[in-house]
Amino acid sequence: MRISVIIPAYNAADTIGACLESVVDGAHEVIVVDDGSTDGTADAVREAFPEVIVLQQSNQGVSAARNAGMDAATGDYFAFVDADDRLFPVALREASAFAEETGPDLLVLRILSDREEHYPWEGRFRPDRDYDKKDIVEEGYLRGSVCGCLFKRDYIRRQALRFPEGISMAEDTLFFNAAVAGEGRIRFRDIRFYHVIERPGSASRSYDEAFFRRLSAALFRAPEMIPDEALCTQVRLSIILSITSHALEQHRSPGWARETTGLDQALPLPVRGLKKGRTMVRLLNASYPLLYRLVQLKKTLTTRG
């Protein structure tokens, strides 16, 4: 059983060496997709890691790079790694052994930085049983990254799943939940798999109007990618809450957020099938300004606490 590790890279010559040191083990396929780098990323990989497959394309974004990697991959499972992050030691060995033993369509592992765990699931899902999309909806589990997961190649191709090109935010959220929305078997396993490397300035971002428009683009792409109505509503609600939170941080009004993102065109969100978040969705459908004030109140209480 072999995993295809797909690494999109753009001007990553300074970081991709350490990334590949943690990934290349001789047992699995590693594909680096150079997305139009100008710093010699592809040459650096070829020189230091001749066993790695290097694809080059014009700069088209991370979604297009991942799609190119999936098209070229021959492994039984896909794993996605960013060029400035790493895998934990023996992570591939442990994950591939469990995937070979249980054969899930989607295997969710652990993703950690030095400070915290990202998208924790312990206490919500057990590692000794299968789950499906109904379980994910009932638990209200949302994940904003495809990293730290294994996706079965045959399942992804059977579902004709692709990363959404043409948007530059929340593409991971859409792909992960599109995979969940199929009729696949989902497993969770307590394996320290993916190591997020935090760097100075990595959390900084410009929250200008273009940022909000990019984020809202995912809001409108979600229905075409996630056919399950309840799951799609959960994803769209999470995007709207993210828009609201960032608008508050920038001292923007609810009217500004609605106009800039075209939010009214996405409403109302359906509530059928929801187990968690029904009240929040109903509040949103009734009055976005009220939802905005609720989020504002929660942020204020959290800050004071």
What positions do the PLM features span?
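Glycine-rich, basic loop-to-helix element that forms the pyrophosphate-binding segment
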Residues: Q57-A73
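Membrane-interface aromatic/basic loop that binds lipid-linked glycans or pyrophosphate carriers
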Residues: D25, H251-G305
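Flexible acidic/His/Gly-enriched loops in nucleotide-sugar-dependent glycosyltransferase catalytic domains
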Residues: F88-E165
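Short aromatic/hydrophobic "clamp" motif used to bind/position activated sugar donors
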Residues: F78
